[in-house]
Amino acid sequence: MNFQGKVVLITGAGSGIGKKAAVMFAERGAKVAINDISEEKGKETVELIKSMGGEAAFIFGDVAKDAEQIVKKTVETFGRLDILVNNAGIVPYGNIEETSEEDFDKTMAVNVKGPFLLSKYAVEQMKKQGGGVIVNVSSEAGLIGIPRRCVYSVSKAALLGLTRSLAVDYVDYGIRVNAVCPGTTQSEGLMARVKASPNPEELLKKMTSRIPMKRLGKEEEIAFAILFAACDEAGFMTGSIINIDGGSTAV
């Protein structure tokens, strides 16, 4: 996969899957706009890419509030926008009784409104250029029920609806839209939660027990799927949902 000359905007790229994807895009020639709500983490990703000889810039912004400015700044910095990766998201825990209206509003703002508006402004730019790609990072929770992930599941299912709708609406403009659905992934955030638990070994065992492969996913495995969904070699793929979950949604 070659992304030479492509400009990629990745939200939530200060850590985790977003950071890994940013590095992998840069390794393959892309210019990467790193968006994150944490200036410190976002700039760390930028410096990492630059240390490898790649090209990147930090674009500060809250996806729920600053979508138009995030896209505008990316285009001002690099002159165009070829690929948007809607990766930023939050993971609240709780069933419907444990979920407040405030929790619902915040989750939907970050996980749905943000990608919706970013896609809206990205599409406007991509139409001018003659095409582009949007990749939405959803979740296995958007496909199956997972205990105490109520509003998270709602938000990630909504992202799949957005993916299919955009794919149909903009196919004639050369814009492809796909989604990836990661399973439980060995990210910085998850492992911090495991280590902070009363019994880390038991929690990890519980997490992997429901996965047919009996292990957690790796950040690079999810990032690779994002790159594939965005690459020119996947030019006939749009409106597709890619599961990377060790078989969890197959049982």
Swiss-Prot record:
NADP(+) binds at residues 10-34. The keyword Translocase does not apply. It comes from the Bacteria. One of its GO terms (molecular function) is oxidoreductase activity. Substrate binds at residue 139. Keywords: Oxidoreductase. It is an enzyme of class 1 (oxidoreductase). Its EC number is 1.-.-.-. The keyword Signal does not apply. SUPFAM superfamilies: NAD(P)-binding Rossmann-fold domains (SSF51735). The active site is at residue 152. CDD domains: SDR_c (cd05233). NCBIfam families: PRK07231.1. PANTHER family: DIHYDROANTICAPSIN 7-DEHYDROGENASE. Belongs to the short-chain dehydrogenases/reductases (SDR) family. This is Uncharacterized oxidoreductase TM_0325. It comes from Thermotoga maritima (strain ATCC 43589 / DSM 3109 / JCM 10099 / NBRC 100826 / MSB8).
